Amino acid sequence: MPTILTIFAWRVAIYPNDHRPAHVHVLGGGCEAVFHLRCPDGPPVLRENYGFSRGDLNKVLLQLEAHLAPMCRAWRALYGDF
């Protein structure tokens, strides 16, 4: 799975052979969360959370918002339209 961004110690990845809508998986420390990107304009929204604290999710969300454009470009490069 391509890592498209690193946020603190967490990897932001798009799984190969994944499905629409455009989304990313955030992994690290035994936790995983999935965020819909809502490309091209956002804002990203949490879809699933497995183990991240609310505070950590807020940190992740701020970084996803700040890096939305390159993540949407990465999704489009792998899968086409959002």
PLM region descriptions:
Residues P2, W10, G42, Q63-L64, ...:
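Functionally constrained cores in energy, signaling, and assembly domains
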Residues M1-A22:
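Short, charged/polar N-terminal "headpieces" of proteins
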